[in-house]
Amino acid sequence: MKPLPRLTFSPLRPTHPHLHAATALYETAFPEVERRDTALWLDMMTTSPCFHALAIMTDDVFAGLITWWQLTEDYGYVEHFAITPSLRSAGIGGVALDKFLSERKGNVVLEVEPPTDEMPRRRIGFYQRHGFTLWALPYRQPPYRRGGEWLKLCLMGNTAEPAPEASNRLVQALHQLVYGVED
């Protein structure tokens, strides 16, 4: 099997040489209901101190992106994670996720669609292979846009599901910081 190229993360900023590729991936990998307006996303790269956008690079080639938030002292939240279509199924996503988790050194939570059909089950399986567990906590994602609908999703974490009180605080922090919603 061919060895994977060297992976690095590069903070995305308005002057990043691969910002155009990252923006195109953001807009095509995630439907409009699963992402914020692109202009706002670009602005957040320099104005939101808890928001981090990273280009995934393989030997100086743009391979994907990870956006994440520092929610609490104990938890980070991966909002978006995507690999460019030409590099999918090559193992780069798993290497990138493992590298992110080892460099971040903390608890991470993310949202996934309920396991009602094949694609969400495959996505959940991918995260499980990289140390995440599907939490039983009922969860709804606030809309990214005014007037949008709340989506029934599931949370996964690289730790065991917290006790109910801690879970509620985590969801409240996620909703307030990421979506601007007061529960």
Name these PLM-found stretches.
Residues R104-M119:
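Conserved GNAT acetyl-CoA-binding A-motif
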Residues F51, W150-L155:
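Short hydrophobic/aromatic beta-strand or adjacent loop that forms the aromatic wall/cage
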